[in-house]
Amino acid sequence: MIEIDNLTKRFGDRTVLDDISLSVGAGEILAVVGPSGAGKSTLSRCVSFLERPTSGSVRVDGADFTRLEGDALIAARRKIGVIFQTAPLLRRRTVAQNVALPLEYLRATDDSVSRRVTELLDRVGLRDRSGYHPAQLSGGQRQRVGIARALALGPSVLLSDEATSGLDPATTKSILALLSHLREDFGLSIILITHEMEVVREIADSVARIDDGRIVESGSVTDVILDPTSALARELLPERPSVPVRGDAEVWEVSHASRHVPLDWLTSIQSVPGISGVQVDVLSASVEAIRGVAVGRAVLAISPAAPPGFADHLSARGLHVTSTAATARKTAA
């Protein structure tokens, strides 16, 4: 488990991180997102103690890194494995030799190194590439070697700093599946620093958005997405292109605000007394499963004569309804 409490980092008079507090339990994945320059990379360096925070604490399995110095800090940092955007592999070393590097620094026995390297290459699906050199590997395979090396010393926390950036979609998906399996197998606490919202949707249990060095929004991924007021939810579920509105219809945006929205919420309108005559046109809609919960958003064109009970009916079924000005969305007939 990793706990970050009131972490602040300053460079001279400039505050880059301001009072950051986050926690990730064993077997959990937290995604940290935000625009370029928001402080994500500095947070990564402070968590791994490549940079010492100005104030606050970073505790891993109860050990407060900010209270440690010298050899004690070096030993404690072994509890955090780091995966970088580009795996920094030594080109003259084989795959197995690259994975073995941290163990060799600790002067582990040859037998223990061999066993550990074989186990890790099995885990990342590269045992048959153990004698290859980095130049003989694909980008995804090199990243798998980096993951294996990050796990060599048996960390309890894995920090991924834009590890899937630049990979093609299929390779990204396979790397995320690997990380998900590893967190289950080893009980890892994983922090994903990323700008890719599909990564958050695919694998994260919780998410925090940093902007200008501060956390502006955080929570479980499903809770964030089901919050109709969340700006982060709109990034996680971007709007789909809509069919233009014609005539004098009113535009409503309908989004899931509950884990229990019935699948027939739209078709059921036709059977509700006093509402069945409402003309409803679907301009756009999307539904997907995230962490086992169906979430979605639809843009509807509603006839002007829609009774107040129509919105109440949708709200009662776990939906959030926002009426927007139709004029901006209309096109000439």
Swiss-Prot record:
It catalyses: L-methionine(out) + ATP + H2O = L-methionine(in) + ADP + phosphate + H(+); D-methionine(out) + ATP + H2O = D-methionine(in) + ADP + phosphate + H(+). Keywords: Amino-acid transport, ATP-binding, Cell membrane, Membrane, Nucleotide-binding, Translocase, Transport. It comes from the Bacteria. It is a peripheral membrane protein. Its main location: membrane. It is found in: Cell membrane. InterPro entries: AAA+_ATPase, ABC_transporter-like_ATP-bd, ABC_transporter-like_CS, MetN_ABC_transporter-like, P-loop_NTPase. ATP binds at G34, P35, S36, G37, A38, G39, K40, S41. Residues 2-237 form the ABC transporter domain. One of its GO terms (molecular function) is ATP binding. It is an enzyme of class 7 (translocase). Pfam families: ABC_tran. GO terms for cellular component: plasma membrane. The keyword Transmembrane helix does not apply. Its EC number is 7.4.2.11. The complex is composed of two ATP-binding proteins (MetN), two transmembrane proteins (MetI) and a solute-binding protein (MetQ). Part of the ABC transporter complex MetNIQ involved in methionine import. Responsible for energy coupling to the transport system. Belongs to the ABC transporter superfamily. Methionine importer (TC 3.A.1.24) family. This is Methionine import ATP-binding protein MetN. The gene is metN.
